[in-house]
Design a protein with these regions (language model features):
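Short amphipathic alpha-helical segments and helix-helix/interface helices
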Residues: 24, 101-104, 130
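Conserved catalytic-core segment of NTP-binding enzymes
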Residues: 108-109, 113-142
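P-loop/Walker-type NTP enzyme "switch/lid" segment
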Residues: 36-109
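Flexible glycine-/small-residue-rich
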Residues: 9, 38, 87-90, 118, ...
Length: 142
């Protein structure tokens, strides 16, 4: 089963998504399969950081609305074969604990690490992600 790591901060702009992307890449380059799960709906950025924006067909919003199967929203990073991403919803949507747990249950045996890239601040997304995580990392300053 995957080790689930939540990445968070008290405010925006401190580098959460950068830390998430680089941590994911570091694990992936060591041959550990990694799934980045971006939870900052309406403000996604991991697709840009990983250079996969043009590959997004479905995102977390589509999973939540039932417009696609979860596996169809997974984007494999072309320069890092062990790194995959589910991009945040393009428009704000509530990501429930149930949704996160469903993804972990469905893909936990395929990925050694699942990294939950949370939105800034303390809110329901962080609370839901933290309930599902084994480890947490708080980014304090840029």
């Amino acid at each position: 089963m995957s080790e689930v790591i939540v990445i968070t901060s008290g405010k925006g702009g401190v580098g959460k998504s950068t830390v998430s992307a680089l941590l994911g890449e570091a694990f992936a380059f060591k041959k550990s399969p990694v799934l980045l799960l971006e939870l900052d709906s309406g403000l996604r950025s991991l697709d840009v950081a990983l250079g996969v924006s043009e590959h997004i067909l479905f995102d977390m919003g589509d999973i939540i609305r039932g417009s696609c199967e979860t596996k169809d929203a997974i984007i494999n990073c072309p320069f890092c074969p062990n790194l995959s991403l589910i991009a945040a919803a393009a428009k704000p949507v509530a990501v429930t604990e149930e949704t996160i747990r469903k993804i972990i249950a469905e893909f936990g045996n395929y990925y050694e690490f699942i990294i939950l890239d949370c939105p800034a601040g303390i809110g329901p997304e962080l609370e839901n992600a933290a309930k599902c995580a084994d480890l947490g990392l708080v980014v304090e300053t840029p």
